[in-house]
């Protein structure tokens, strides 16, 4: 059985993956790499208060971070 923290992290990651895969049509593997290398993901893993924010709030942060990335560069950091 997973902890509440793990469950919240899965929800947030799935929200970011859904945005990249279903809305922007990125391949799943590339999307997973982008999410896991993002500053938003690292903030989620390090800050419990941020992890408890709503998915729309976190997704908005991820979208802003993603918008600052050059189209040819898949790395969000």
Please identify what each model-predicted range represents.
Residues 1-77:
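C-terminal alpha-helical interaction appendages
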